[in-house]
Amino acid sequence: MSSEDYGYDYDLLFKIVLIGDSGVGKSNLLSRFTKNEFNMDSKSTIGVEFATRTLEIDGKRIKAQIWDTAGQERYRAITSAYYRGAVGALIVYDISKSSSYENCNHWLSELRENADDNVAVGLIGNKSDLAHLRAVPTEESKTFAQENQLLFTETSALNSENVDKAFEELINTIYQKVSKHQMDLGDSSANGNANGASAPNGPTISLTPTPNENKKANGNNCC
């Protein structure tokens, strides 16, 4: 029986988290990739929200469930729940703000502490449209990504440059890990929650088996 017989419109569901300092453009990257929208009056995200987009890889429908949260210190309490079950992560910085790039070390460390070692990770230098204000050299970021085995792309949520590429490369990397069994089948059933990568009416695909816990997004006020 196919997934369509159960009312699902996908074969696999991947949980991906966006991390990085507040104001680097995480919310607009999310809305650009999932809805092809950009909000010029973007404000810092309050709480957590997610959006989805479905892609096809090797004839399989992959639904990416992408989570976004604010980067301010006062929201660090949600860290463990936010990362739990994630099979992919994108660390985002603003190419015109060196401090946001310097803090990528912190975000990577926090990810490593809260997620499995096999989680697929990409580094995004956002706001490439502000090249005239560049404070972070591309080569420096490339070197950091190579040293830490991260995917790397510079993007512009404003004009869409490389946004699809960044997300699609990460999703493809996750799919390859699943195909090579670097990510194991857990015991949880897919129910639309945030428990990682899952198959309709079947076991959750996650880096390590996790209990079936329902996660809810709080304060869905993102721009």
From Swiss-Prot:
Membrane topology summary: Lipid-anchor
SMART domains for this protein: RAB, RAN, RAS, RHO
Subcellular location: Golgi apparatus membrane
Ranges annotated as biased composition (Polar residues): 204-223
PROSITE patterns (UniProt xref): RAB (PS51419)
Chain positions with N-acetylserine modification: S2
Stated family: Belongs to the small GTPase superfamily. Rab family.
InterPro entries found in the cross-reference section: P-loop_NTPase, Rab_GTPases_membrane_traffic, Small_GTP-bd, Small_GTPase
Keywords from the UniProt entry: Acetylation, Autophagy, Golgi apparatus, GTP-binding, Lipoprotein, Membrane, Nucleotide-binding, Prenylation, Protein transport, Transport
Annotated protein name in UniProt: GTP-binding protein YPT31/YPT8
Naturally occurring in which organism (per UniProt): Saccharomyces cerevisiae (strain ATCC 204508 / S288c)
Regulation of this protein's activity per its record: Alternates between an inactive form bound to GDP and an active form bound to GTP. Activated by the guanine nucleotide-exchange factor (GEF) TRAPP complex, and inactivated by GTPase-activating protein (GAP) GYP3.
